[in-house]
Amino acid sequence: MTQPYQRILFATDQSENNVTALERTAEYANKNNIQLDILYVLDPAIAGFGNTQIELSSESLYHLEEKSIGQLEIIKRRLIISGSSIYQVHVHLRIGDPRIIVAQEFPTEYQNDLIVLSSSRKNHLQRFFTGSVSSYVIKNAQADVVIMH
């Protein structure tokens, strides 16, 4: 990475696959004094078991939001304990299509110049119905994109 990045977006699916990739990204951000946005996108289509015709009740959505925010705060605390600055790490939750939010909406709003994704936990059937977030982001993002395993 030769370009001095200013703000990194790490998009998480809150799976165990993300842990190493997030730790490495946070270490890079910390060493280079770069802002780190950690984003989780709650996809109602997936939360509704893949059927976009079934809408989640507002109570169910509220509970999913609260659980997700709690998990993001745990991630933030772990990074701060391991050396990141409280002013450097920011956690965010959005609801919608992860492909659009990660590739376009969020980086535009927060001016992220690097997007980091980790390898997907979706199986082939899920990827068939919902599409690959990574593939979409690579094709449509204006920022540089890194996929970590």
Residue ranges and their predicted role:
Residues 1-20, 82, 113, 139-149:
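Intrinsically disordered or low-complexity boundary/linker segments at protein termini
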Residues 2-55, 109:
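Small/aliphatic-rich secondary-structure junction motif
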Residues 39, 90-94, 146:
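General small-molecule cofactor/ligand-binding pocket signal
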Residues 49-59, 74-85:
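Inter-domain helical "communication" segments and dimerization helices
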Residues 56-70:
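A short acidic, glycine-rich active-site loop
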Residues 114-139:
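Glycine-rich, Arg-bearing micro-motifs that act as flexible, cationic patches
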